[in-house]
Amino acid sequence: MVFVLCIVCALLLGCTFKDYKELLKDSGHGVCFSSKYGKAPFLMNVGIFGLMIVAYFNLAGAIDGRNVWTGMTFGIVFCMLATCNSGSHPGNVWPIMAGYMVTSFLFGGIFKLLGGESYGLTIGSQSILIGLCYANGLSPVVGKYGAFWGMLLAAAHYLLVTAVPDMHGGFCLYNGGFTAALICLLFVPQLERFCKTKEEKKAMKA
C-alpha cells in the first residue's frame, strides 16, 4: 500500500512515463536521482522498485513453499529501498535478482543429483534473501556493463556470500556488502580492461 501511494503521489506531482523512462536508462553510477531527475521520478522509483522487491520475495516464498516475511526480511526491504535515490532502479536490479534465482535452481539441482536430501540455500531461505539485499550494491556495474554481467556477478555473490564469513571470522557484520565490494574488486578492473560499456556499444552502432 505504501508503494502504491508513492506511485500515486509521483503522478500527482507530475511524473510522466517519459520522465521515469529516462531514469531507468541511467546506469546508476555516482548519481542522485532526486537531484538529477526531480522528486517526482524519484518517488515513482521508490514505489515501483518497492513493489518489485515485494513481488520477488513473494515469488521466492511461493517457490520454496514458505513464508519469507520475518522481521529481518521486512528490514532488508527498506535497506534495499535506501539505495533507490543513489543508483538502484528496476532496470539495473532485475538481472541481480534473476542471477540469484537461476544460481539457486542450478546448484539446488546439482545438489539433488549428487544425492543431497535438503539444500539449505534455496531462493526463499533467509540467508539468501539477505544476501540479495546487499548484492543490490552491484547495480551500478549492471547499469554500466549490462544484464549479462549483472547475472554473472549476482551468481558470484550468491556463491560467496555464505562462505566469506569464514574469511573474516564473523567480525564483519556487513557481510553481504563486504562480499559485493570484494566482487567489484575482483571483476570491475577486468570489465574496464576487456569489456565495453553499454554507452560505448551504442556509440559503435551509431
Language-model region placement:
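Transmembrane helix-bundle signature of multi-pass membrane transporters/permeases
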Residues: 80, 101, 133-140, 155, ...
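Short helix-perturbing small/polar motifs within transmembrane alpha-helices
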Residues: 106-110, 131-146
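Signature of multi-pass transmembrane helix bundles
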Residues: 1-59, 122-123, 145-150, 159, ...
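Conserved mixed alpha/beta catalytic, RNA-binding, or beta-rich assembly cores of soluble enzyme
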Residues: 56-120, 124, 133
